[in-house]
């Protein structure tokens, strides 16, 4: 066996290289895709092995995939990102073409005009200039021109709005202005003469008199307390002879009380809603007959009524107000009556001519209180717009603008010295203004709640009385404006106050339906 295997192996000989045939590389034959072949076959209408039903079954089974030729869309967020990149390149291209001023102040002005912060933390002029360039590349250079045009238009509109408009008044107004001028000038001369005489008094004498006054004021006590009505009492006012006190109530009633025993004398019936104020005629109980008009009152329904002392019914009604009348006040002459209204105006009525001679606007909100100068030449008004105005009745001009309160002005009063004005406001303060300096000279942090009324002592103005919603009334020195006495005793808000013409009595009325008289011991 071994010998036979060896012999067989030996008999196999290796073929020479030239006899081996070379390997031929066969070319690839491309028959096309089945999908294209199938499309061609279907286009020619050939049925072949697969019919329409077989083709449909193959497509449904997923064995045959025939595309519709639609292009595969890129995802939405990828396309948005590409758009943002292109937009950023365009913005940078625009930014390079924008010319920005190298003046830093002008750059800041442009940023302010565009409503952007003029500077950022750690930003220098170069960075600020580049920031302006980037902003303009986004909003466009026309935006800066547009803001400048808008600013010019707003300036023009403000200038037009601030223009003073004059309306032609009736001839009766001209007659009244001349009459007031002739009435006030002699009184002003008399007041100045009295001031000169008072200045000639030695300083020691004046100081001792002031000390005595302060001592008596510190000894003020509640002399009488009376329940005045079933509803809150909104206003109180002494008669010129200090023998009577008039009160106004939210029930619509007005009442007259004897002083100092506080007995009810008359009940005046005529108003149907809250009465805002009732005031005595300047000559009532002094030289005026009881049958004449002695009192005037106003109410929230816009009614203003005139009263005599011998009747419980109103003598006359003043018509013309369509909204709430907050206050009424007599001119020192007694011929004119001033009313403040919630239609942003105040009015002056000539009772002798029985007509409205002045309808004065000037406040942006309702006018709440009015006061007349002792001479009769000026009128002061306080409004719910937190501003006060001083008007010259002889010319009709606003001679002083009282700006400084943060909230509504509810009380205003002139000092007998002729140049001080006090205003009480909803910001809990009382401000003292000087007509000569045309500014606020002192701010009294008077109360812990809104101040409802202010009143100077009517003879020399030696002290100032304030009342507020903190249930108290306070007395302040004049000048100096230091606190002297706090009149505490009411259980509700102090809504009104007054000082008798002789300076001996103080009256306060409250939301607790009572009024109180205060007198020195």
Curated annotation (Swiss-Prot):
Superkingdom: Eukaryota
PROSITE patterns referenced in this protein's UniProt entry, alphabetically: WD_REPEATS_1, WD_REPEATS_2, WD_REPEATS_REGION
Chief localisation class: nucleus
Chain positions of WD repeats: 228-267, 270-317, 320-359, 362-401, 404-443, 446-486, 489-521
Cross-referenced InterPro entries: G-protein_beta_WD-40_rep (IPR020472), PRP4-like (IPR014906), PRP4-like_sf (IPR036285), WD40/YVTN_repeat-like_dom_sf (IPR015943), WD40_repeat_CS (IPR019775), WD40_repeat_dom_sf (IPR036322), WD40_rpt (IPR001680)
Residues annotated as transmembrane: none
N6-acetyllysine, modified sites: 26
Protein task: Plays a role in pre-mRNA splicing as component of the U4/U6-U5 tri-snRNP complex that is involved in spliceosome assembly, and as component of the precatalytic spliceosome (spliceosome B complex).
Cellular localisation: Nucleus; Nucleus speckle
GO biological process: mRNA splicing, via spliceosome
Record's protein name: U4/U6 small nuclear ribonucleoprotein Prp4
GO cellular component, one term: U4/U6 snRNP
Assembly and interaction partners: Component of the precatalytic spliceosome (spliceosome B complex). Component of the U4/U6-U5 tri-snRNP complex, a building block of the precatalytic spliceosome (spliceosome B complex). The U4/U6-U5 tri-snRNP complex is composed of the U4, U6 and U5 snRNAs and at least PRPF3, PRPF4, PRPF6, PRPF8, PRPF31, SNRNP200, TXNL4A, SNRNP40, SNRPB, SNRPD1, SNRPD2, SNRPD3, SNRPE, SNRPF, SNRPG, DDX23, CD2BP2, PPIH, SNU13, EFTUD2, SART1 and USP39, plus LSM2, LSM3, LSM4, LSM5, LSM6, LSM7 and LSM8. Interacts directly with PRPF18, PPIH and PRPF3.
Source organism per UniProt: Pongo abelii
GO molecular function, one term: U4 snRNA binding
Nucleotide-binding among keywords: no
Assigned keywords, A-Z: Acetylation, mRNA processing, mRNA splicing, Nucleus, Repeat, Spliceosome, WD repeat
SUPFAM superfamilies from the UniProt entry: PRP4-like, WD40 repeat-like
């Amino acid at each position: 066996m071994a010998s036979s295997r060896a012999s067989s192996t030996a008999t196999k000989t290796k073929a020479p290289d030239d006899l081996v045939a070379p390997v031929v590389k066969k070319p690839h034959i491309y028959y096309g895709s089945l999908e294209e072949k199938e499309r061609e076959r279907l286009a020619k209408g050939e049925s072949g092995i697969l019919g329409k039903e077989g083709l449909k079954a193959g497509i449904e089974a997923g064995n045959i995939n025939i595309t519709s030729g639609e292009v595969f869309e890129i995802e939405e967020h990828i396309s948005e990102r590409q758009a943002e990149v292109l937009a950023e390149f365009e913005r940078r291209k625009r930014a390079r073409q924008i010319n920005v001023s190298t003046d830093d102040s002008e750059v800041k002005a442009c940023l302010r005009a565009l409503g952007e912060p003029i500077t950022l933390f750690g930003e220098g002029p170069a960075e600020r200039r580049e920031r302006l360039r980037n902003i303009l590349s986004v909003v466009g250079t026309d935006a800066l021109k547009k803001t400048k045009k808008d600013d010019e238009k707003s300036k023009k509109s403000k200038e037009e709005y601030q223009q003073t408009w004059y309306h032609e008044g009736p001839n009766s107004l001209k007659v009244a202005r001349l009459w007031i001028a002739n009435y006030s000038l002699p009184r002003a001369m008399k007041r100045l003469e009295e001031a000169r005489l008072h200045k000639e008094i030695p300083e020691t004498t004046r100081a001792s008199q002031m000390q005595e006054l302060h001592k008596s004021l510190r000894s003020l006590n509640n002399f009488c307390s009376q329940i005045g009505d079933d509803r809150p009492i909104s206003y109180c006012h002494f008669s010129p002879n200090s023998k009577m006190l008039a009160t106004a109530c939210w029930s619509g009633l007005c009442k007259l009380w004897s002083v100092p025993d506080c007995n009810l004398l008359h009940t005046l019936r005529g108003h149907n809603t809250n009465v805002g104020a009732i005031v005595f005629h300047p000559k009532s109980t002094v030289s005026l007959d009881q049958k004449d008009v002695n009192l005037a009152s106003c109410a929230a329904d816009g009614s203003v009524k005139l009263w005599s002392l011998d009747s419980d019914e109103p003598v006359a009604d003043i018509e013309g107000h369509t909204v709430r009348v907050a206050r009424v006040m007599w001119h020192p002459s007694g011929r004119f009556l001033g009313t403040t209204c919630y239609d942003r105006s105040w009015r002056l009525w000539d009772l002798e001519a029985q007509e409205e001679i002045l309808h004065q606007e000037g406040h942006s909100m309702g006018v709440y209180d009015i006061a007349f100068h002792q001479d009769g030449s000026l009128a002061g008004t306080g409004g719910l717009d937190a501003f006060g105005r001083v008007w010259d009745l002889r010319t009709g001009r606003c001679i002083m603008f009282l700006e400084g309160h943060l909230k509504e002005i509810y009380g205003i009063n002139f000092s007998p010295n002729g140049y001080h004005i006090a205003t009480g406001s909803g910001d809990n303060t009382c401000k003292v203004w000087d007509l000569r300096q045309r500014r606020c000279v002192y701010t009294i942090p008077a109360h812990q709640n809104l101040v409802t009324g202010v009143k100077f002592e009517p003879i020399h103005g030696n002290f100032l009385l304030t009342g507020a919603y903190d249930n108290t009334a306070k007395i302040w020195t004049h000048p100096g404006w230091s606190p002297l006495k706090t009149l505490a005793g009411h259980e509700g808000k102090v809504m009104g106050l007054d000082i008798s013409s002789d300076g001996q009595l103080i009256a306060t009325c409250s939301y607790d339906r009572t009024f109180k008289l205060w007198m020195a011991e």
